[in-house]
Amino acid sequence: MMDEEILDFQSVFRLPDESNDDLGTLVSGSTSQLARTVLLQTVLVRATSTAAMLGAAGAHQVCLQAWWVTLFGLDSVAVSAQALVAASLGKNDVPGARIAADRALSWGVGAGVLVGVVVFLSADQLPYIFTNDAEIAAQAATPIRILALLQPLNSAVFVGDGVFQGSADFDFLAKAMAISAGGGILALTAAGQMEGASLTSVWLGMATLMFGRAATLGWRYFKDDESPLYVTPFECAVYYDDLPSVDVDFVDVDAKVSKDETTKPR
C-alpha cells in the first residue's frame, strides 16, 4: 500500500493560485501555441483533401513524407536558435540574442540551400523511397522540385519560429500563423476549383503558406520595433565594443628588417 505522504492526491487536483502571474503567462502561451498548431494542421488537412479531389492523394503523401524528412533535419537549427535566444534573453542580453539569431538564420538558410540542391537533383528518384508505383512517383516529381526550391525559405521560417519561441513571443506566432494559414487555405481552395489543376497546384498553395509565414516573421524580426529582439545598429555596435579585446603588439616588419641589416656584422 502506497504511503499517502508520498503521493498526495489532493495536491495533484488542487487548483493553482490565481494570484500567480506565471500561471497567466503559461496559459496564454500554451493557448497561442495550440491555436498556431490547429491553424497549421487545418492547412495541411485542406491540402490533403484537395489532393484527394484531384486524384493525387498517393503522390501527395509521398511529397508530405519528403517534406517531413527535410523539416525535421532543418528544424535542428531552429531548436539550437530557441535555446541560444532564450539563454541570452534570460540574462537581459538582447543584442546577444539578436546576434545568436542572426547566426542561426545564416546557418539555417545555408543548410536549406544544401538540402534543396540535393532534393532537386534527386526529385525523380526520391519518390521511390516511399512508393514502388511508377505513376505515383511520376506525379510526385514536379511537386518535389517545388519543395526543393522552398528549402531555403522553409529553413528560415523554421529558425524564425525557434527564435520567437525562445523569446516567448507566442501571441505573435499565433497571429502570424492565422494570416499565413488564411492565405494558404485561399490558395488551396482556388487550386481545387481551377480547371486542369494538378498536385503541382496544391504545392503552390503550400508555397503560399510558407511565403506568408516568411513575410510575417521577417517583418517582426527586421521591422517591428516592438519585437522582443529589436535592437538598433548603435546597440549592436556597443555590444561589439564591450566584447573583451586582445592586445596585440604590431611590429613594423620593414623597419625591423632594415634595423637587422644595419646591425648585422660585416
What are these regions, as identified by a protein language model?
Residues 57-123, 155-168, 172-173:
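Small-residue-rich hydrophobic transmembrane alpha-helices
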Residues 24, 63-70, 134-160, 182, ...:
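Alpha-helical transmembrane segments of multi-pass membrane proteins
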